[in-house]
Regions:
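Aspartyl protease active-site motif detector
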Residues: 2-47, 77-89
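Short, intrinsically disordered/low-complexity patches at protein termini
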Residues: 39, 48-49, 112, 142
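C-terminal reverse transcriptase regions that engage the nucleic-acid substrate
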Residues: 44-59
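Basic, gly/Ser/Thr/Pro-rich low-complexity segments located predominantly at protein N termini
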Residues: 24-25, 57, 64, 94
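Intrinsically disordered, low-complexity regions of eukaryotic proteins
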Residues: 24, 48-50, 113, 137
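Short solvent-exposed loop/turn micro-motifs enriched in small/polar/acidic residues
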Residues: 7-9, 40, 56-58, 71, ...
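Aspartic protease core domain of the pepsin/retropepsin superfamily
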Residues: 63-142
């Protein structure tokens, strides 16, 4: 990360969620990264939240993401919705070639191509990752 100006990166705590159908970020989070139309927003996709209500997909924020111990940024597209915190969908991560291992004290995501392990911490009954994001000059995820 030292080759990239620190001011361009923003730190986030992302909850690793095996029940999330998409990787999402709150509307108010990372406002400096523009929202772009996504396949889901074009289709009028809505998400059902814990209280049974539905919220619309508003598009996506295309980001470069660094994680603890990583040496190269990864591309990720966060879907934007009126959620309370950033969520990383385990299903979407698996679709991108990551294996998720969770245990009593934490775990990791393992990239099937590079074998890189991204650490996951356990906070109470939640699993979280510390990440740094900035706007991606590219398209969506790899």
């Amino acid at each position: 990360m030292s080759s990239v100006p620190a001011a361009t990166w923003r730190e986030l705590e992302v909850t690793v969620d095996s029940g999330a159908c998409d990787t999402v970020i709150p509307t108010e989070e990372c406002r400096e990264i523009r929202i772009q139309e996504s396949a889901q927003s074009k289709q009028g996709l809505e998400y059902e939240v814990a209280n049974g209500e539905t919220i619309p997909n508003l598009g996506e924020r295309r980001c470069l993401m660094m994680t603890e111990g990583s040496t190269t940024p990864k591309r990720i597209a966060f879907q934007v919705a009126d959620v309370h915190k950033p969520l990383l969908s385990v299903t979407r991560a698996a679709d991108m070639g990551y294996q998720c291992v969770l245990g009593k004290t934490g775990g990791w995501l393992q990239d099937s191509q590079s074998d890189e392990r991204i650490p996951i911490q356990r906070k109470g009954n939640l699993y979280v990752m510390k990440v740094w994001v900035r706007e991606s000059p590219f398209g969506g995820p790899r």
